[in-house]
């Protein structure tokens, strides 16, 4: 006679192949579900890459004339050798980003540069105020530098920037009531499709430009003309930085989505191989059970 323990062990041994089969079927369902999800994600990343490529082509075309005007405006400060007075302490720091992500380290590189500049200027005894162009830079810096934010601009990056947008930003800065002595604008300069560089360019207030020693040689420039030119110059530099940042962002997003699509393809290949191996194991096991059962009947 069989003992209860022996019968229990026999029952467990008999049911074990069924449990293995159920587990393998569950694994196949999980793999199928993951494959479907990754394929859907790959469709999205490929579509985003195509959209970014179209926007990048337009941004690169519009960057060339904007770069000429921007570098021309910055040339005034270089050729006139305008420098901020040492005894003045008010410094304005402008960071250019956008409202959209999925573009690599575009926004974090700007935030990193701004944090470094804030630390350096604060250690030198300067009063630093921040301006964020784009919601991403505000989101990164606001938690640690909320008391230093002068103004933040949203709705940036959804459409190609225009000179009108830059003029609105420049006018808002001039009407903010903060009379800075000198400042800097930090943005990503476009270099190639796969490369960009975080750059910092100087900006100066009207009083700083008017009181510069090199400006005294221009006797025929009155205050109104200089003020109008300085306002236009500020808008021009902001427009130039927006165009550089937009082109860098679209190229970085195109590269990021291309890498994401390639990674999705690799995952699909690996999961497909795993699915085929698991399915083959299930089929082989079922054949073994059928053959074993037929042999037992004989």
Curated annotation (Swiss-Prot):
Subunit description: Component of the ATP synthase complex composed at least of ATP5F1A/subunit alpha, ATP5F1B/subunit beta, ATP5MC1/subunit c (homooctomer), MT-ATP6/subunit a, MT-ATP8/subunit 8, ATP5ME/subunit e, ATP5MF/subunit f, ATP5MG/subunit g, ATP5MK/subunit k, ATP5MJ/subunit j, ATP5F1C/subunit gamma, ATP5F1D/subunit delta, ATP5F1E/subunit epsilon, ATP5PF/subunit F6, ATP5PB/subunit b, ATP5PD/subunit d, ATP5PO/subunit OSCP.
GO molecular function terms listed in the Swiss-Prot or TrEMBL record: proton-transporting ATP synthase activity, rotational mechanism; RNA binding
Keywords: Acetylation, ATP synthesis, CF(1), Hydrogen ion transport, Ion transport, Membrane, Mitochondrion, Mitochondrion inner membrane, Phosphoprotein, Transit peptide, Transport
Localisation per UniProt entry: Mitochondrion inner membrane
Pfam family, one: ATP-synt
Cross-referenced InterPro entries: ATP_synth_F1_ATPase_gsu, ATP_synth_F1_gsu, ATP_synth_F1_gsu_CS
Gene: ATP5F1C
Function: Subunit gamma, of the mitochondrial membrane ATP synthase complex (F(1)F(0) ATP synthase or Complex V) that produces ATP from ADP in the presence of a proton gradient across the membrane which is generated by electron transport complexes of the respiratory chain. ATP synthase complex consist of a soluble F(1) head domain - the catalytic core - and a membrane F(1) domain - the membrane proton channel. These two domains are linked by a central stalk rotating inside the F(1) region and a stationary peripheral stalk.
GO biological process: ATP biosynthetic process; oxidative phosphorylation; proton motive force-driven ATP synthesis; proton motive force-driven mitochondrial ATP synthesis
Membrane topology: Peripheral membrane protein
Full protein name: ATP synthase F(1) complex subunit gamma, mitochondrial
Positions of post-translational Phosphoserine modification: 146
PROSITE patterns assigned: ATPASE_GAMMA (PS00153)
Modified residues (N6-succinyllysine): 49, 115, 154, 270
Family listed: Belongs to the ATPase gamma chain family.
GO cellular component entries: membrane; mitochondrial inner membrane; mitochondrial matrix; mitochondrion; proton-transporting ATP synthase complex
Disulfide bridge map: none
Modified residues (N6-acetyllysine): 39, 55, 115, 154, 197
Keyword Ion transport among record annotations: yes
Cited NCBIfam families: ATPsyn_F1gamma
Tissues with expression: Isoform Heart is expressed specifically in the heart and skeletal muscle, which require rapid energy supply. Isoform Liver is expressed in the brain, liver and kidney. Isoform Heart and Isoform Liver are expressed in the skin, intestine, stomach and aorta.
